[in-house]
Amino acid sequence: MKHTHKLWIALILTGIVGGMVGIALTELMHFIQHTAYGYGTGGGHVSFREGVVQTSSERRILVLILCGVAVGFGWWSIKRFSRPQIEIKAALKQPLQGLPFLTTVSHALLQIITVGLGSPLGREVAPREMTAAFASVGGRRLGLDEDDTRLLLACASGAGLAAVYNVPLASTLFILEAMLGIWTQQAVAAALLTSVTATAVARIGLGDVQQYHPAHLDVNIPLLWFAAAIGPVLGATAVWFQRSAKKFPFLKRNDPKIIPLAIALFALIGIVSVWFPEILGNGKAGNQLTFGGMTDWRYSLEMTAVKWFVVLLALAAGAYGGLITPSMMLGSTIAFAAAAAWNTFFTAMSSESAAVIGAAAFLGVYLKMPLTAIVFILELTYAPAALLMPLCITMAGAVVTARKMGFE
């Protein structure tokens, strides 16, 4: 078989595997959520936020203690008994070394289990890593060279993201902007192929799901002025969040002391959730409130502070997980609260639109992928194209501010 044919066959298979991984992990997470919090058994759709709110305070705390046990003992066991873990970004530097399959799969499954139990981190790293683990095995068996294997692993990472969020174009940009940093014709074609394939396969099992249903996404001149004003605020806040998060965990994950620490910190998260149930899970609950205009500025600011706090607690406990949706929640709650202040003194504009552009700007700065973040939020919300202008204005101000603060 020709070398080029091997690569494109591997990319197609990776897209298929990415879609299947997305289905399996999403269903697993939903099963854990429904079982742990006791909702959704009577039929009909109930969101995680609604399910948690309906659950007693005692049950929330007990579930989070169980989550702490899984975090502490789970990652201690992986670090203690498994082969050394290799992150995808590190694997791209030495692609032929590959990813340790069992370690990576165990690591991904544990992320989904803990997020399902209420860990305040994101779920998106798990399908990315698991898909990349399968791609690593496939690339090795097909005898792909270093450059082709690097492309395959990067595309596998994007395929996992596309599958769980139903965002084929944003995942294509993620591969090019965040993973590879190149925009060759081959890379663009490969990224599109795997992302679209993974999304199509995932839709067979999960449906063509719109992740958020925002209300009143109106665009007017005041929103453009607000976008210019809020961008630097979001850029600076995203930098501060990154700097606060990188200090954790306190202990190495192979230190047995991390187990009681994780249990204690997650018990504290459970106690906090008695008053702020929206902080549990990856942050989608908070975004649903701000995007839908279902909260006020006071609670929005409180959610900002509390979500920031519990994310740091989870990281200090040694938990792994993504930060796409948590960072979106921080950006959306900040912008939603700021919009309320704006509307008090200036011509009114849509607070929901403000929340959407805030989520994108915070995400774009924090994960250093501004183009991906803009398209990501559009695909998640089905927002109108008219929102592109305020999105770009906010993102520009946020990115420039972050660079001025030394965040490259």
Give residue ranges: language-model regions.
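Alpha-helical transmembrane segments and immediately membrane-proximal extracytoplasmic
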Residues: 1-408
